[in-house]
Amino acid sequence: MSFTVAIVGRPNVGKSTLFNRLVGKKLALVDDTPGVTRDRRPGDARLMGLTFTIIDTAGLEEADEESLQGRMRAQTEAAIDEADLSLFVVDAKNGLTPVDTALAEMLRRRGKPVVLVANKSEARGSDSGFYDAYTLGLGEPTPISAEHGEGMLDLRDAIVEAIGKDRAYAKEDVAVTNVDISEAAGEGEDEDEEPLYDDTKPLRVAIVGRPNAGKSTLINRFLGEDRLLTGPEAGITRDSISVEWDWRGRTIKMFDTAGMRRKARVTEKLEKLSVADALRAIRFAETVVIVFDATIPFEKQDLQIVDLVLREGRAAVLAFNKWDMIEDRQAVLADLREKTDRLLPQARGIRAVPISGQTGWGLDKLMQSIIDTDRVWNKRISTAKLNRWLETQQIQHPPPAVSGRRIKLKYMTQVKARPPAFMISCTRSDALPESYTRYLINGLRADFDMPSVPIRIHFRSAENPFEGKKRRT
């Protein structure tokens, strides 16, 4: 992108609505509750021929540095320093407040270009608020309606004037993003070939878990900076925020998500939106790290989150966080491994890594587990190998007989990866018990080294070419 723009202003003036308008998607949560946005969220904006990076920020308020609002303010100030231009959004409908005046003074001290934006200008009675904005001393306000998309041409012209025409329309090579990845991964490849794993491809990783498990602290430790808002308060993260960094030459795109509580406890509309946003992050990710609090692991919600991730078909890795608070580590680790095997039978062989997001202990091992799990998630097995394996499995443990006739498994092939899915042609597929399916899945895990990822097997009844034809007499 040619330049970076930060959207700033006090809470509830419509910053996230404007952000969603500029990126063309509902990426940021929007609600009437003030202070919905807490972390800074970047996005790729397009506006009437302009392309640039846009950063949504938390509402600026006067607050003590150590308070949650104070830490949110520090994140917003970091975005202002990072940006080339700030869009200072005020509420023309409800008018200015002393906070607006203080923020205008702060932006002037920064010495960077500012475009004053009078949002909600479509509302009745907004003229007074629009003209009051002149008193902020930041030039002529640009009237817009972020909700209805009005005034976008004027906003573009104001940005071009502030940043300069050459900078605004600078050409550069832009990498292709938002590529639609077909679920039929490997489609078009020879089914008897086993493609090599591409360890240079960017990897999407979602970090999920219960509130206050240390998800944001973990990502900050990976990045080596306080990029995400953290603190002792549970439920700080609301939006799913994505950040990028390199690990041993590979681009990693990580999604921090809101803590996921039991549905019965989620009553507020805003928290429901946050959890829905976390679910979208899980579906967009390739590998999901489920963060457990090692001091109170295997709560019911922990188990439900793991089950959700596997049902969504994602590769899963467990991270037992806060390991720096554990005293008898060997005994606790042995107990965690026993409980993992016993309480998560559907995730047999899942990789589980003790870590400390606070100190950074164990993070290299966690990253290697993420890469190894993604490798398995992308695995493809040749049809020839699968059918030799299927024959051996039936010899060792034949399928059951139905009405005196044994079910025959005739042919097997892998129909997709991400996660691995297989199709078996057989007789009487409707009569094959679930226990035999589990036997085959466990065999695939053991014989083809496929731990920790969902494996799906679909059965298709082999057609009888003589069915329905009259017998000769």
Swiss-Prot record:
Chain's role: GTPase that plays an essential role in the late steps of ribosome biogenesis.
Single Gene Ontology MF annotation: GTP binding
A Pfam family: MMR_HSR1
Annotated KH-like domain residues: 379-463
Lineage summary: Bacteria, Pseudomonadati, Pseudomonadota, Alphaproteobacteria, Hyphomicrobiales
Residue numbers binding GTP 2: 209-216, 256-260, 321-324
Positions with a binding annotation for GTP 1: 9-16, 56-60, 119-122
GO biological process, one term: ribosome biogenesis
SUPFAM superfamilies with a match to the protein in the record: P-loop containing nucleoside triphosphate hydrolases
Family: Belongs to the TRAFAC class TrmE-Era-EngA-EngB-Septin-like GTPase superfamily. EngA (Der) GTPase family.
PANTHER family per record: GTPASE DER
EngA-type G domain ranges (all copies): 3-167, 203-378
Keyword Protein biosynthesis set for record: no
Keywords: GTP-binding, Nucleotide-binding, Repeat, Ribosome biogenesis
Protein name: GTPase Der
Subunit structure: Associates with the 50S ribosomal subunit.
